[in-house]
Amino acid sequence: RGAFEELLEVKNKCAYAQELDSTGAVLAKVAATPGAIGYVSLDVVDKTVAALKLDGVDATEDNIKAGKYTLSRPFVMATKGSVSSQSELVQTWFNFVKSDAGKKVIKGVGLILPE
């Protein structure tokens, strides 16, 4: 919710009719309730709901990558200090995420790879 409020600049301005604790619950509620609005990741939007156009721009992977669809945020991985100063396990994880196999996993779970 924090990212939604921050990106739309509506923090402390929303009166939520109902707060749900899972993506599936949000999709089901929005699909069943005329006029409902919910927020979920792009990869789970299905034909039961419609993704919001923002300033006339469709919510697509290409538009997100191009910076045209601004209602998105990156996932980040962080360490205390440089990756090269971390344990071998942590370094192995970062190397995997950047590898072709890691990118395949990222795409497989519906996330958008950075350019």
PLM feature segments, named:
Residues 1-115:
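Exported/periplasmic ABC-transporter solute-binding proteins
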